[in-house]
Amino acid sequence: MDRSQHIGVLAGEKSGDILGGAVLRELKRRRSNVSFSGIGGEQMIFHGLTSLHDMERLSVFGLVEPLKRLPELLSIRRSVGQHMMKHQPQLFLGIDSPDFNLTLEQTLRQNRIKTVHLVSPSVWAWRPGRIRKIKKAVDLMLCLLPFERDFYEQHG
């Protein structure tokens, strides 16, 4: 796998898959020989993603379900991390799902894989302490809401 033409991508839910599908489509249009691996749904797979796990396995809600499924979720994250370390993508794009992606992104970044995160966690509304983790995990944050960019600029 040619590192300069490979991008790791992970979306954990349908809305992320829709956004990711649009991103992958545009990247393919600009660089026809780019390849993608990670986790995604129908849209991302349609646009060329090799999905390592079923995205639906990451879609957990509430307090009890994530706790029940914690061993499986940790195993999936470890598996994706090992895949990325082995294949050394040019960059890794985490789409939303911050509770899953930020830890993975931090590990990858510590191992010199560039990380991009699409859809900012709402640190401006709740859990502002996550800004420290984001700084450690993410090389570039792509925000959907205009004021989010200002928030990140104010907080370094």
Residue ranges: model-predicted function:
Residues 5-156:
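Active-site and donor-binding regions of nucleotide-sugar-utilizing enzymes
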